[in-house]
Design a protein with these regions (language model features):
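An N-terminal assembly and electron-transfer interface module characteristic of large anaerobic redox
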Residues: 1-188
Length: 188
């Protein structure tokens, strides 16, 4: 909340969602820390998941970096701000887009390609590990007959700074909390 409040003067509209408003505080913190650069890409859609054909992000996720670039110039000062539009849905297209976006930085195409391969593999491993952990947790909860709630919402609801402590409130009532991205694959 403090982070949000200290950049409230840079938020152009009350109609922006809370996570978008929170970005302003993060950017101010980064600029004040005098980081080498700020990397905040515009992502139109993510990788295809299962059989879903709707992998588009909301307009705020897609374009908010552009708003930050134009509304926070005074805050960022001379800190380089990178906000390329990236095709995160397709790793093959991602490499050339990153090479173009990072042309001013000392990264070779092979380094970028290796980084994308490593990151993609790690993300898939993380998802697989999470699915397996959820599967084991569900089995234990069923065996122990623990009341359980699947807390569904936007991905940012997992952020403790945004979710208002809802998961903790639920667990304080003796119930378990599972996330929709953890249980969704179990129904397949």
């Amino acid at each position: 909340k403090d982070q949000y409040n200290k950049a409230i003067d840079t938020i152009p509209s009350d109609t922006a969602c809370y996570p978008a408003k929170a970005v302003h505080g993060h950017i101010r913190d980064l600029a004040q820390a005098q980081v080498d650069l700020i990397w905040y890409p515009c992502i139109q859609h993510g990788p295809k998941e299962f059989s879903r054909d709707n992998n588009y992000h909301c307009p705020m996720v897609i374009s908010y970096p552009e708003l930050i670039r134009n509304n926070m110039q005074d805050v960022m000062g001379k800190t380089p701000f990178y906000a390329p539009f990236l095709p995160l849905a397709d790793k093959k297209s991602l490499v050339p887009a990153l090479v173009k976006a990072l042309k001013d930085l000392p990264f070779s195409k092979s380094e970028i390609s290796n980084a994308v391969e490593t990151a993609w593999a790690e993300q898939e491993k993380c998802k697989a590990d999470y699915r397996e952990m959820t599967k084991k947790t569900v089995s234990r909860l069923v065996a122990e007959q623990v009341p359980t709630i699947v807390l569904a919402g936007r991905p940012y609801h997992l952020d403790s700074g945004i979710n208002h402590g809802i998961p903790e409130l639920i667990t304080s009532l003796g119930m378990a909390v599972l996330t929709e991205d953890g249980v969704a694959p179990l129904g397949r």
